[in-house]
Structure formats: C-alpha cells, structure tokens
C-alpha cells in the first residue's frame, strides 16, 4: 500500500501507473515487461486493472449507463460480444452481479452513472474491476464516500482477491485502511516514494514521520 497526505503526488503517480502519462524506460515493469510506454487499454490487456480516485469522467462516463460503463472497462470485451456484436444480455448479467455483490443502490443497470450517489458509484467501479480477477489491481481511495458496511465489503473483496494470488496496490489517505489491509507499506511525500516500512521494527511511528516529510529511506 501507499500512504500519504493528499497533494503529495498521488494523482501524478496514479496517472503514470494507469498509463495516462508515460514513464521512462525500465522504470515501470509488469511481469518482467517494460510497460512505461503502454496506454491504459494495453495495460488492461495484460490483466492490470484500475480504480481511480475521480469517479465521474475518469472512473466512469457520466452520461453512459452502468451497462455501457461495464463494457468500456473490458479491453477485449471478453464474453460480451458475438461476431462483433455486443451481447447486451451478458453485459447486463455482469452489471447485475456487481450491483448485487456490492450492494449498489440503483433501480437498474440501465441507469446513467451520474444518477448514482458517489458512494454507490464507487462500489460499482470497484466491483466492476474485481470481478475480472486481475493479476494486478490498483485502487485509489477504495472506500472514499461509502458507508461502514460497504467499506467492509470492499475491504473483504480486496483481501479475498489477494488470497487468490492477485497483487493489490492501494493508494489511500486513510492510514487505518492502509494498516489494516496492506502487508507492505510505502509513504508518498512531496512526490517521493519511501522504501517499504518495516512494521515490526519501526511501525506507525516511522510511517507518521514519513508522512510529514521525514527521511524517505
């Protein structure tokens, strides 16, 4: 996990990780492959999935339905097309699975993304990525704006995914969330990423020091 106070480079880091900004050669690799020049679509094809902090306009298209947003997150539309034609019944089935599993409060998967509350849209976006069982999922502020019960559901889903062998990277301002979910913790401060904190040796005191601009390594 990556902890840090807002405004210390989290947005820029996420843009690099999801492919919206290029990175220098061999700085960013996945499964031994240099992905620095790959865009988001190409990275999704490698089974890298993302939940950005900004919901509308970044994580979801406001004027599209939940079904349409579900389809957009699939780089190859796997199982959702037949002979180049969208199978909307299958798309809706995936959407309804997310709505049910993550308790998304909406009358229908045909509702526009912008009609959902921030918390419900967050649950839909997280669920949309998790049901893909990705090799890697990067989530920024996974439970921002959701109620305690829904936050626990999202946390348990992330833990379950990790238990199945997926890599999970969480970027969060919520230190309690980072501490409860993450085995390795780094701190982002003033655009610099610390080494992993030895929780047994240094623990919370070291993380707190780094978050206010202490020595990064």
Walk through the language-model features, giving the residues of each.
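Glycine-rich phosphate-binding loops of nucleotide-dependent enzymes
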Residues: 1-217
């Amino acid at each position: 996990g990556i902890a840090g106070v807002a405004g210390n480079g989290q947005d820029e880091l996420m843009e690099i990780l999801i492919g919206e900004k290029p990175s220098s050669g061999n700085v960013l690799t996945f499964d031994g492959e240099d992905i620095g020049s790959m865009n988001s679509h190409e990275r999704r094809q490698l089974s890298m999935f993302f939940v950005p902090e900004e919901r509308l306009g970044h994580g979801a298209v406001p004027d599209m339905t939940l079904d349409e947003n579900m389809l957009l997150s699939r780089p190859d539309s796997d199982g959702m097309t037949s002979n180049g034609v969208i199978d909307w019944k299958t798309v809706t089935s995936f959407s309804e699975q997310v709505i049910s599993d993550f308790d998304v409060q909406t009358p229908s998967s045909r509702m526009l993304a912008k009609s959902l509350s921030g918390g419900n849209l967050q649950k839909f976006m997280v669920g949309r990525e998790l049901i893909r069982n990705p090799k890697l999922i990067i989530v920024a502020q996974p439970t921002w704006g959701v109620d305690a019960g829904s936050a626990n559901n999202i946390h348990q889903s992330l833990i379950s995914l990790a238990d199945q062998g997926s890599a999970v990277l969480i970027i969060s301002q919520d230190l309690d969330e980072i501490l409860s979910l993450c085995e390795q913790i780094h701190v982002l401060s003033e655009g610099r990423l610390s080494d992993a904190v030895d929780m047994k040796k240094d623990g919370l005191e070291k993380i707190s020091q780094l978050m206010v601009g202490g020595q990064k390594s």
